[in-house]
């Protein structure tokens, strides 16, 4: 009786434990969505397939129209072109009238940029073709044009388009070969060949990012020669930046290596490659053997007729963890000798070969969804946190009785609170997500970037802080008026306000995008919750609400990070020892990369870039500088800065450790990855949602909200301070103290609302690329702002005109580096500061000394 009762309790406890976990489930929906309009239910295998605009083209290919192979039939080739269209979610396929290929062709390869499809090589009854031609235009005006010819003797296997080039994997003179075709100049360049076994046909060749850099993946294939037919299961990674190949985890099903030929593969999400079906070659080799034995014709016919169809599985390869998983096993077998193409968020697999010698007329549609449920308990946790922040705003609004209190807290903020506030402001939600994501996807190469805060703090304390404290500036840019002129101050202030507006939108949009992808929370709700609550508490309570809000948020996000790290490591096979062993084996703790590759985050890049960017933040960013004056005296500010710097060291270890732990966990459990994850920055919230219990996951999501809101509140408050001190009080010289506070609150609401609206626009319209360019240009100006302070503090020679020349020259130099070099953007802060100072200093010999 007692045992029975204990069993019931155990079952109940297990059920309860399972129920409190939030689970992200990947669902694959596969079906026959349309048929090709061909006679007698025939289709086309080995066609050129690709997307042109909003249609998928199927050009050429082959079939056994008159008799099947076991009946002695001969393969015939097509010159027709068919188009698959999507009208309101319903697929249809029709022949494109009056459009024909130059000659009937099949078994070539296709690649394209979404506007033009390049058809490469192929063969027909007359032999192999070395021609490349294009298909482009609309469905009503589709054009076939000759493009160029392949190098003599080169036989293409597969191709992929990327950034103006077509990479073509193939063979020549009995060896592997890789060519790169420059689409603009139509010139070929021979690249490093794959060092693996010769593969001549049937491979998948797909571009995908590997977490560190761009890469191409060659999967499977086959070749034939005097020794017979060889099937490949190997996977090779090609790195175009270095022109090198790396051997990766072999194609496998449940850990069992499996040969693969003529599967269909597509890039999916930020780091997955999906492989649909394919042939393992077992039955193919049997038929080949029977075909060579003339004494067993009946067995050969039986082998053809008894074939059950090709693989029914969808496989997923994850480029970061180098792991294979079986995503789904379907009720229908998938065709081979075809190409999978993405169309309007779905994957289309047209026609192909259903069984040996038998074409498929079906157009297969695949939809993949990763469903997540946030749950009412998690919502409750987040709502309680948001109400707490609003209450803080109401509390401090009753204590603000003047502009000095609103902008500088009356100098009454404890030094430790100011230090935590500076720390929390610098650790935005983007950082909260991106540091673990960077360590997860790559290694600790950027760790030293965070450590440079220890180099920055002494410079700020000894050279910048005395001036800010002496002038008692509410706006950092008041110093520029004293050192140069009012026009330089207004220039800097205007660009700072514009940059803050863009930063507010980005700080709202990017975390909301990541949270929406993994939690299912509506992206607009995310933006509005963070934006509206932050606007309320920071405009009501002023800098005091901002600082004390940062303290609460800093404690929440650090506490949440500690919980996460402990939980992740606890879920790794082997615990902490297992975590360390895998991380060391995979070189995830690599910090001291001493190479002089300025395109990568090597040691020198991290040190120079980190120090320069930290210096920019702590000397010219109003959202940080403003907090220097919230403390009673200079000594207190110094202690606050040192606290911020010292906090950054263990926190860097913590967040890089979380990223490495995520890598180890998902390398062991790749089936738990979200295949549709569009950005690697979502990996941390994805883990939070799929592995942490309800309530705890809500607390961690609240921590991400906190990281975003601490930055947002400082951005809004600093913008209103600059607008009030640098513009409003200069226009209305006799304004009262109450009018200044009223203006600050109204301008804070306006700036915050504009940022929210811009974030909503980014989430609604396809303007992300345009916005990125705009934000990039404004980002260049931050180097110029830092350069103005550098010129003003470290030399007396530079005057107003020289300072403006340095400001403009810095932007030009950075634009030139961006356009004509591959230098990593991590160095832009260093390049900007140096160029701004040097150009300003040199121009002072033309314009004369400053004051």
Tell me the role of every PLM-derived stretch.
Residues 10-20:
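Bacterial N-terminal signal peptides
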Residues 25-374:
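Kelch-like beta-propeller repeat domains
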């Amino acid at each position: 009786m007692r045992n029975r009762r204990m069993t019931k309790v155990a079952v109940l406890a297990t059920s309860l434990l399972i129920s409190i976990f939030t689970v992200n489930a990947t669902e694959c929906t596969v079906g026959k969505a349309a048929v090709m309009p061909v006679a007698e239910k025939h289709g086309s295998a080995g066609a050129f397939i690709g997307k042109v605009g909003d249609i998928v083209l199927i050009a050429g290919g082959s079939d056994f129209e008159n008799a099947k192979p076991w009946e002695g039939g001969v393969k015939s080739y097509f010159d027709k072109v068919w188009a698959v269209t999507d009208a309101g979610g319903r697929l249809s396929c029709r022949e494109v009238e009056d459009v024909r290929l130059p000659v009937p062709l099949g078994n070539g390869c296709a690649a394209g940029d979404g506007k033009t499809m390049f058809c490469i090589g192929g063969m027909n009854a007359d032999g192999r073709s070395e021609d490349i031609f294009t298909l482009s235009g609309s469905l009503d005006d589709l054009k076939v044009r000759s493009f160029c010819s392949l190098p003599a003797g080169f036989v293409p296997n597969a191709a992929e388009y990327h950034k103006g080039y077509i990479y073509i994997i193939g063979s020549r003179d009995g060896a592997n070969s890789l060519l790169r075709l420059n689409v603009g100049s139509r010139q070929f360049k021979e690249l490093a060949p794959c060092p693996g076994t010769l593969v001549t046909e049937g491979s998948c060749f797909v571009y995908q990012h590997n977490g560190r850099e761009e890469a191409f993946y060659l999967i499977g294939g086959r070749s034939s020669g005097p020794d017979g037919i060889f099937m490949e299961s190997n996977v090779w990674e090609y790195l175009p930046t270095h022109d090198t190949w790396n051997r990766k985890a072999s194609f496998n099903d449940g850990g069992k290596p499996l040969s693969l030929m003529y599967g269909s593969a597509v890039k999916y999400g930020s780091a997955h490659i999906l492989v649909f079906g394919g042939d393992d070659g077992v039955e193919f080799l049997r038929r080949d053997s029977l075909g060579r034995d003339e004494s067993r014709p009946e067995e050969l016919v039986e082998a053809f007729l008894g074939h059950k169809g090709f693989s029914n599985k969808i496989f997923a390869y994850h480029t970061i963890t180098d792991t294979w998983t079986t995503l789904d096993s379907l009720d229908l077998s998938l065709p081979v000798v075809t190409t999978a193409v993405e169309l309007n968020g779905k994957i289309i697999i047209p026609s192909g070969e259903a069984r040996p010698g038998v074409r498929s007329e079906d157009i297969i549609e695949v939809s993949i969804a990763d469903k997540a449920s946030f749950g009412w308990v998690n919502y409750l946790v987040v709502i309680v946190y948001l109400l707490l922040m609003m209450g803080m705003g109401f509390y401090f609004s009753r204590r603000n009785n003047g502009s000095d209190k609103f902008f500088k807290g009356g100098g009454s903020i404890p030094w430790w609170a100011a230090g935590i506030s500076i720390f929390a402001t610098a650790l935005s939600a983007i950082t909260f997500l991106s540091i673990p994501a960077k360590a997860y996807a790559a290694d600790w190469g950027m760790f030293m970037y965070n450590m440079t805060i220890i180099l920055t703090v002494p410079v700020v304390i000894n050279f910048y802080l005395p001036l800010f404290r002496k002038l008692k500036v509410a706006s950092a840019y008041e110093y520029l008026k004293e050192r140069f002129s009012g026009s330089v101050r207004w220039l800097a202030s205007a660009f700072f306000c514009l940059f803050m507006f863009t930063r507010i939108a980005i700080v709202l949009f990017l975390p909301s995008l990541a949270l929406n992808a993994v939690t299912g929370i509506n992206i607009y709700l995310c933006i509005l919750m963070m934006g509206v609550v932050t606007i309320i508490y920071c405009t009501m309570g002023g800098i005091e609400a901002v600082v004390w809000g940062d303290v609460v948020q800093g404690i929440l996000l650090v506490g949440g990070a500690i919980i996460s790290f402990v939980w992740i490591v606890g879920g790794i096979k082997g615990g902490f020892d297992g975590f360390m062993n895998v991380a060391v084996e995979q070189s995830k703790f690599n910090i001291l990369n001493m190479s002089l590759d300025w395109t990568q985050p090597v040691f020198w890049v991290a040190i120079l870039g980190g120090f320069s960017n930290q210096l920019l933040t702590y000397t010219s960013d109003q959202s940080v500088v403003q907090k220097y004056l919230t403390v009673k005296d200079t000594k207190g500010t110094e202690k606050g800065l040192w606290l911020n710097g010292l906090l950054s060291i263990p926190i860097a270890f913590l967040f890089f450790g979380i990223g490495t732990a995520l890598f180890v966990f998902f390398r062991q459990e790749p089936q738990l990855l979200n295949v549709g994850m569009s950005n690697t920055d979502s990996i941390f919230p994805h883990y939070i949602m799929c592995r942490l219990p309800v309530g705890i996951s809500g607390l961690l999501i609240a921590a991400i909200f906190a990281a975003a809101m601490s930055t947002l509140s400082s951005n809004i408050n600093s913008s209103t301070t600059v607008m009030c001190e640098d513009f409003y009080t200069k226009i209305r010289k006799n304004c009262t103290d109450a009018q200044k506070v009223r203006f600050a609150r109204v301008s804070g609401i306006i700036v915050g609302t504009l940022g929210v609206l811009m974030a909503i626009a980014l989430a609604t319209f396809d303007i992300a690329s345009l916005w990125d360019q705009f934000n990039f240009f404004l980002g260049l100006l931050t180097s110029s702002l830092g350069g103005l302070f550098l010129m003003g503090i470290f030399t007396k020679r530079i005057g107003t005109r020289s300072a403006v020349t340095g400001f403009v020259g810095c932007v030009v130099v950075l634009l030139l580096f961006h356009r004509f070099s591959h230098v990593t953007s991590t160095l832009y802060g260093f390049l900007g500061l140096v160029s701004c100072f040097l150009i300003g200093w040199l121009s002072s010999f033309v314009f004369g000394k400053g004051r």
